[in-house]
């Protein structure tokens, strides 16, 4: 599942952090 952070970053359940 992909969750959007308040900053708009996508947090992956795999533990990876992707900044969009």
From Swiss-Prot:
Alphabetically ordered keywords of this record: Disulfide bond, Protease inhibitor, Serine protease inhibitor
Family listed: Belongs to the protease inhibitor I3 (leguminous Kunitz-type inhibitor) family.
PROSITE patterns in the record: SOYBEAN_KUNITZ
Organism of origin: Albizia julibrissin (Silk tree)
InterPro entries: Prot_inh_Kunz-lg (IPR002160)
GO molecular function, one term: serine-type endopeptidase inhibitor activity
Source organism phylogeny: Eukaryota, Viridiplantae, Streptophyta, Embryophyta, Tracheophyta
UniProt superkingdom: Eukaryota
Keyword match Disulfide bond: yes
Function: Inhibits trypsin and alpha-chymotrypsin.
Tagged with keyword Cytoplasm: no
Protein name as catalogued: Trypsin inhibitor A chain
Subunit structure: Heterodimer of an 'A' and a 'B' chain linked by a disulfide bond.
């Amino acid at each position: 599942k992909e969750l959007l952070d308040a900053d708009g970053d996508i947090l992956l359940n795999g533990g990876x952090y992707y900044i969009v």
